[in-house]
Amino acid sequence: MPSDIYRWLARYYDHLFEFRRPFEEAREVIIGPLLPRIYTACDLCCGTGGLALSFASQGVRTFAVDLSPEMCRITRGKARAVGLPLKVICADMRKFALPEQVDLITCEFDAINHVPRKSDLARVLKCVAAALNPGGHFVFDANNRKAFELAWTNTWFADRDPVAVVMHSTHVPGTDKARSEVNWFVRQGKLYRRHQEHIEEVCWTHAEIVQALLEAGFDRLKTWDAAPFFNDELTRPGCRTFWRARKRP
């Protein structure tokens, strides 16, 4: 995956997207019971750093990892602005490494789906397991094929000065891949300059994820359907799943 794939998404992510509340509610249920025993954490595919900064603000020694240099730059800037210690690492989730093992690794906003091949899941989980303390937990959410079938077959538009975005998503029925063509229109004076990005995702069956987690050394697997947390038309039952897994001691 090219490191600049989300250059424009990074630049305007906080300006355009407001998906935080459903994830905050999910964290209370899924991560909340673990927090008293979490002293070190890593947010994998950290985006613009919201969750990593939240951990750091609670006194958790935190790492933030993202492939996008622009996402990393924004996250570092936010940490400096509020005076929080946060180690930001620019790395591919399929081959990242941390300076030390941690108690918790998170990977939100279906970031785990953003790999080129289904076989890459094993590579991601191998790195996650290596970065966790024995008994540590991995918490992530993943889009399922139903999400591709229902939500990745439309066009989404948003306009918030100085940028507008058109996202056209496609999914070939019966496959485990989906693609979005993203057109950014950034205002420059009286004109708009157009920029393009391509976003691709793959998905796995429940059984495939279970097998991959077990083979990577995880146990105590638990899942939650995302629909009750989101309560919107794009996240129907079966579309997105939250996962929690423990690295075997």
What are these regions (language model features)?
Residues 204-249:
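C-terminal lobe and adjacent flexible extensions of AdoMet/dcAdoMet transferase-like proteins
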Residues 50-95:
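Class I SAM-dependent methyltransferase SAM/SAH-binding core
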Residues 97-104:
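A short acidic, Gly/Pro-enriched loop at the edge of an enzyme's catalytic core
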Residues 108-110:
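Residues lining the SAM
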Residues 139-211:
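SAM-dependent methyltransferase
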Residues 122-134:
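A short glycine-rich, Lys/Arg-flanked "PGG" loop and its adjoining helix->strand segment in the class I
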Residues 1-47:
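Conserved class I S-adenosyl-L-methionine
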